[in-house]
């Protein structure tokens, strides 16, 4: 419902682009359902840039593995800038990230349960 309100405003302003940072997409509590603006309003896909990575959900903080999806011209421009300003992550980090993203996701629920328990202990 909240995201729908946001996307309704965005649809009234076609000059506004959307940048989402979805790094916590898997670490949600209770009955909260993670959704992106483009999932709620598919007409936003052409002006949405979605960033994500493995540092939070896959406990790979500091490994500097992230990814982005969006309109091809923007991704190409980002690739040109990124390739000139940073170095590549190590191959072992890349393999670990791929394994995390493609493997069983059940452990994430266990992490969320542990986080909730810590919060309750306060």
Where does each model-flagged region fall?
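Active-site pre-lysine segment of PLP-dependent enzymes
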Residues: 1-15, 24-60, 72-73
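Glycine-centered flexible beta-alpha turn that most often forms the glycine-rich phosphate-binding loop
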Residues: 21
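Alpha-helix capping/termination and helix-coil
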Residues: 27, 119-122
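Conserved core segment of the aminotransferase class I/II
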Residues: 41-116, 120
């Amino acid at each position: 419902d909240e995201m729908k309100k946001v996307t309704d405003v965005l649809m009234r302003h076609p000059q506004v682009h959307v940048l989402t940072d979805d790094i916590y997409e898997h670490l949600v509590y209770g009955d909260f359902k993670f959704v992106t603006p483009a999932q709620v309003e598919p007409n936003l896909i052409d002006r949405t840039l979605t960033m994500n990575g493995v540092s939070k959900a896959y406990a790979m903080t500091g490994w500097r593995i992230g990814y982005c999806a969006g309109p091809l011209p923007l991704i190409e421009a980002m690739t040109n800038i990124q390739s000139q300003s940073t170095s590549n992550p190590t191959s072992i980090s890349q393999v670990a990230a791929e394994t995390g993203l493609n493997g069983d996701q059940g452990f994430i629920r266990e992490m969320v349960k542990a986080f909730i328990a810590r919060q309750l202990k306060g």
